[in-house]
Curated annotation (Swiss-Prot):
SMART domains: Ribosomal_L14
UniProt-recorded name of the protein: Large ribosomal subunit protein uL14
Function according to Swiss-Prot or TrEMBL: Binds to 23S rRNA. Forms part of two intersubunit bridges in the 70S ribosome.
Cross-referenced InterPro entries: Ribosomal_uL14, Ribosomal_uL14_bac-type, Ribosomal_uL14_CS, Ribosomal_uL14_sf
CDD domains from the UniProt entry: Ribosomal_uL14 (cd00337)
GO molecular function: large ribosomal subunit rRNA binding; structural constituent of ribosome
Gene expressing this chain: rplN
Xref: HAMAP family: Ribosomal_uL14
Subunit structure: Part of the 50S ribosomal subunit. Forms a cluster with proteins L3 and L19. In the 70S ribosome, L14 and L19 interact and together make contacts with the 16S rRNA in bridges B5 and B8.
Gene Ontology CC: one annotated term: cytosolic large ribosomal subunit
Pfam family, one: Ribosomal_L14
Keywords: Ribonucleoprotein, Ribosomal protein, RNA-binding, rRNA-binding
Biological process, per Gene Ontology: translation
Length: 122
């Protein structure tokens, strides 16, 4: 579960390394985000020469959470870290590569480009 002020790792090559959650999008008063939800983030740490600069406010989609998500068959999937992918307005990734596994729940949110670029879909 991701809420305001949560720091996440960035799982793409857009240039950002770490981001801070500003807002969870999707309804008034929504407090937490899970895998597949869109959030507004501020870049706290970035690589030099990247597409995204430090201090920039961008949208991102959550791809991994420590708290995990419950599947319809009753199983849970949890990850070792909280991670996101920075996206454009058309839900496509700003970077050209995705690092690490992503959850299958991203297909339901129409993030097919992220799913196709990911090395592993769990």
């Amino acid at each position: 579960m991701i809420q305001q002020e949560t720091r996440l790792k960035v799982a793409d090559n857009s240039g950002a390394r770490e981001v801070l959650t500003i807002k969870v999008l999707g309804g008034s008063g929504r407090k937490t985000a899970n895998i597949g939800d869109v959030i507004v983030v501020s870049v706290k740490n970035a690589t030099p020469g990247g597409v995204v600069k430090k201090g920039e406010v961008v949208k991102a989609v959550v791809v991994r959470t420590k708290s995990g998500v419950r599947r319809n068959d009753g199983s849970y999937i949890k990850f070792d870290e909280n991670a996101c992918v920075i996206i454009r307005d058309d839900k496509g990734p700003r970077g050209t590569r995705i690092f690490g596994p992503v959850a299958r729940e991203l297909r339901e949110g129409n993030f097919m480009k992220i799913v196709s670029l990911a090395p592993e879909v769990l």
